[in-house]
From Swiss-Prot:
Protein name, UniProt field: DNA-binding protein TSIB_0525
Source organism per UniProt: Thermococcus sibiricus (strain DSM 12597 / MM 739)
SUPFAM superfamilies: Double-stranded DNA-binding domain (SSF46950)
GO cellular component, one term: cytosol
UniProt similarity note: Belongs to the PDCD5 family.
Coiled-coil intervals, chain numbering: none
Gene Ontology molecular-function annotations: DNA binding
Xref: InterPro entries: DNA_bind_arc, PDCD5-like, PDCD5-like_sf
Organism classification: Archaea, Methanobacteriati, Methanobacteriota, Thermococci, Thermococcales
Alphabetical UniProt keywords: DNA-binding
Length: 112
């Protein structure tokens, strides 16, 4: 009887360890894929943005990461569609940021 209980515990422990190992592998794979995508994104940004524009986007990413990510994704889509024919300067990036910010900004009004 005690041996049966011990056997059940051992099987349960092995099962839990196996599940934990699978979860860990899945998480590591997801992290690796995210890092690959980020590296590809940065490589494309290097190709289509001037150094000043990249610096600006990096600063925007510190303050408004969701806005910076949205701009990056839009720029990648345009690049992949062949709609970006020349490097984007800091001035062009400012205009793009302003346009996207205007579309996504939520307006708050305080009534007295």
């Amino acid at each position: 009887m005690a041996e049966d209980i011990e056997e059940i515990r051992r099987k349960k422990l092995l099962e839990l360890q196996k599940k934990l190992a699978e979860q860990k592998r899945a998480e590591e794979e997801q992290i690796r894929q995210e890092m690959e995508l980020e590296a590809q994104l940065q490589a494309i940004m290097k190709q289509i943005l001037t150094s000043e524009a990249r610096e600006r986007l990096t600063r925007v990413k510190l303050v408004r990461p969701e806005l910076a990510r949205q701009v990056e994704l839009i720029l990648v889509q345009l690049y992949q569609a062949g709609q970006i024919t020349e490097r984007i300067t800091d001035e062009k990036l400012k205009r793009i940021l302003a346009q996207i910010d205007a579309r996504t900004r939520k307006e708050f009004r305080i009534k007295w």
